[in-house]
Amino acid sequence: MAENTIKWDKDADGIVTLTLDDPTGSANVMNEHYKESMHNAVERLVAEKDSITGVVITSAKKTFFAGGDLKSMINLGPENAGEAFDTVEAVKRDLRALETLGKPVVAAINGAALGGGLEIALACHHRIAADVKGLVVGLPEVTLGLLPGGGGVTRTVRMFGIQNAFMNILSQGTRFKPDKAKEIGLVDELVGSVEELVPAAKAWIKANPDAHE
């Protein structure tokens, strides 16, 4: 049985905070625990959306989300191709369901959000990052001979256009610090501390109740 890696908290205003917190590791990664937990969380959001006003996604770890589970990926071979494809498609379906929930969804980025971590944030309608030491965002998959598989290609192209997305984000594998990430549009807002993140995210939801796809 997979460990639950996402804590659910709903406040009096109907805002649900999903806190990524994998009990099996020091960082959140896109392992089987995450995949099942995110699927269950999204199903619950859809089922209860009439009583929900918005969603905040944040992390209890020092990093927001470290990306793919490299330990599992390194063991993949041709015989696992079908299974790997199905897994990636399931991840994309859940993020798309989150994106099209019909409620504003905000990523409250408290630490590094790389690869799959940034892809989770890109599925949100607003991204707030703490301007703190060590926080970087990016899609570094190309440095491993890979491309983002969780919707990052589609969403960056939609946000920035094909040439800009490819040349400046996808093909370089650059890790952007908070100020640069905001400058280029990967994040929308900066706050001065991690403690300010969730309150800022909730304030944005209240001010933008119709900010959803």
Annotate each predicted stretch with a short phrase.
Residues 1-21, 26, 122, 164-213:
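Amphipathic alpha-helical segments at domain termini/boundaries
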Residues 1-58, 82, 93-96:
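Conserved CoA-thioester-binding segment of acyl-CoA-metabolizing enzymes
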Residues 97-144:
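Glycine-rich beta-to-alpha active-site loop
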Residues 124-149, 185-201:
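Gly/Pro- and small hydrophobic-enriched strand-loop and loop-to-helix capping segments
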Residues 153-164:
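Hydrophobic, secondary-structure "cap" segments at the distal end of domains
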